[in-house]
């Protein structure tokens, strides 16, 4: 009796398991490599998806230079998925004429750099400031997901560039909030 041929495996897992068809509980990590949908990298990508949704709503509520900055931020966030999936380096962070270090400096020293002391958002603040604050929290949550997704057992990160980029986007959100609070141009 002839031996039936085994169908070729279209999909594999990182540890070598093979599947002819993609199981519903799994998704693509990259190429034909599948992982469970609960995998930390997939959770990170879900965080990016949520962050994009928050950015879209925030940009829709904004106008002028603030809207332009938020749209540029959206493009940058979308590039983080590409960097993850294709294992490419993250592009240089640059917003409001500031590089990553400048963004950090302005957000850490707002009174010196922006003429506005630190503050806690309040219900009386303009709606766009509160939306920016919500956006900032979405960035922070995504940064935490990235830390989890890219942490190695020795405490280092496989993708420190992605984590740092998200940290600087959080700084950018603070700067935008500060500028709205002080009533100046973004």
Language-model regions: role of each:
Residues 1-186:
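Phosphate/pyrophosphate-binding loop motifs in nucleotide- or prenyl diphosphate-using proteins
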């Amino acid at each position: 009796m002839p031996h039936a041929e085994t169908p070729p495996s279209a999909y594999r897992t990182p540890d070598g398991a093979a599947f002819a068809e993609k199981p519903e509980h799994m998704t693509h990590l990259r190429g034909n490599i599948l992982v469970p949908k609960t995998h930390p990298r997939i959770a990170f990508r879900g965080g990016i998806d949520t962050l994009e949704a928050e950015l879209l709503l925030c940009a829709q509520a904004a106008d002028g230079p603030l809207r332009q900055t938020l749209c540029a931020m959206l493009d940058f966030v979308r590039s983080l998925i590409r960097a993850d999936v294709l294992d490419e380096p993250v592009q240089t962070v640059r917003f409001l004429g500031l590089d990553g270090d400048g963004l950090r400096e302005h957000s850490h020293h707002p009174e010196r750099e922006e003429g506005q002391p630190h503050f806690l958002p309040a219900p009386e603040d303009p709606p766009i400031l509160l939306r920016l604050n919500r956006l900032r929290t979405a960035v922070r949550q995504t940064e935490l997901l990235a830390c989890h997704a890219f942490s190695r057992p020795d405490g280092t990160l496989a993708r420190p560039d992605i984590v740092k980029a998200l940290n600087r986007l959080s700084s950018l959100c603070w700067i935008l909030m500060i500028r709205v609070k002080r009533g100046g141009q973004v």
